[in-house]
Amino acid sequence: MNRILRLYAFLLPLLAAVFVFEFGVNVPYWDEFEFAGMMSGGPGFWKYITAPHNEHVMPLGKLAYYALARLTSMDSKAMMYLSVIILSIPYLLLVRRIRTHDLMAAAATVLIFFTAFFSPRSCVNLLWGFQPPYLAAFSFGILAILSCDWFLRTRNGWHLLAASLCCTAASLCSAHGLLSWVSVALAAIYSRQFRKCLASLAPAAIIAACYLVSARHFPPAAGGGGVSPAGS
């Protein structure tokens, strides 16, 4: 049974890759047309990077998408495969982490959840080429959870600091800024637990302040639609 579950766990991301191979096409979607304007890296490049995209503040995600677009020559299907890889890494880490402690827990939680997550209906979302920044945010969130788990088991302060950095990175990839507040809390615990100077709070506090300023000056459009100021 152990081998069957392990084989099943590793087959799920492979099936997602087969789905992309079968149904993916190199055709940009709506947001990708807007992002294509910055691919040249022209004079308004950095202004576009720092401007909100709808309700998202995602400079790290935009930079990642820019790099991927240049690397793949704006090949949407190549980015679909990359989306599968980005999803598979934290998934396999979760399977390995839980399996080492309780096989039934892995079967009842991770495998059941990802069976739905990698199902053909969910894999339709992978056919949107502009997924890597959002999936990177998801992956950083999973890594933050794993880092907190490692901290609880080992009491190693570096794991808690890694969780804080993962939360900040997730917020900068595509989140609405909520995870930046988690990173502040984790940094505060790190500072208190290990008697570090309060300077360890500075990066997370700056990120949170940037989100507050951005939310004040660039509120999301009604219904979450519209385009970013730089793209209008």
Regions inferred by a protein language model and the residue ranges of each:
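Membrane-proximal lumenal/periplasmic loop motifs of glycosylation machinery
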Residues: 23-28, 42-70, 74-80, 84, ...
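Transmembrane alpha-helices of multi-pass, membrane-embedded glycan-processing enzymes
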Residues: 65-69, 79-93, 133-140
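Transmembrane-helix motifs of polytopic, lipid-linked glycan transferases
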Residues: 81-105, 109, 143-147
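Perimembrane helix-loop-helix junctions
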Residues: 179-209
